[in-house]
């Protein structure tokens, strides 16, 4: 998917750590990347597929990935800080949801959605909300346990957290090779 493409664009230095495409004029005339980049209304685009129905990756596509990456990573760091937990103390990082089951660890870490330090700790659990709903419907004990757990949960407004804007801005940067 798009994360795999962005990871490769970063790896090949077609996209810089700030999320911008490299400039065509900065490439040598024999650079293979020249054939994969084009200008369209003064905006750079990457040609993913060039046959009859072109598939392009635009600067806007990269920015959308970058914003999602910044939100997820900054939320991850903010939660660690609030819980006063060091990243090295994490036993596992659980990825839930149907979407998460289709995203590789390589892409999550390669794009910087999650830090490389948790690479070996990532565990996929599938559609946990659906499983939880089934459990709540089928078991009074499970439902009671969920109710008790919900009373222990705390709400955290990321945007209102001290220093969050700076953290978010820092987390927008893509990892470098």
Model-derived regions: residue spans:
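Helical "lid/coupling" subdomains associated with nucleotide-phosphate turnover
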Residues: 1-177
């Amino acid at each position: 998917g798009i994360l795999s493409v962005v990871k490769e664009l970063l790896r090949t230095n077609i996209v810089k750590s700030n999320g911008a495409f490299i400039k065509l004029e900065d490439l040598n005339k024999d650079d293979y990347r020249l054939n994969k980049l084009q200008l369209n209304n003064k905006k750079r685009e990457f040609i993913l597929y060039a046959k009859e129905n072109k598939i392009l990756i635009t600067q806007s596509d990269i920015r959308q990935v970058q914003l999602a990456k910044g939100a997820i990573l900054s939320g991850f760091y903010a939660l660690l800080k609030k819980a006063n937990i060091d990243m090295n103390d994490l036993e596992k990082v659980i990825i839930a949801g149907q979407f998460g089951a289709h995203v590789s660890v390589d892409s999550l870490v390669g794009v910087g959605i999650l830090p490389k330090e948790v690479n070996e700790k990532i565990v996929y659990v599938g559609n946990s909300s659906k499983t939880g709903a089934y459990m709540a419907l089928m078991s009074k004990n499970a439902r009671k346990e969920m109710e008790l757990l919900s009373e222990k949960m705390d709400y955290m407004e990321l945007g209102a957290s001290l220093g969050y804007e700076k953290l978010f801005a820092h987390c927008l940067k893509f990892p470098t090779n």
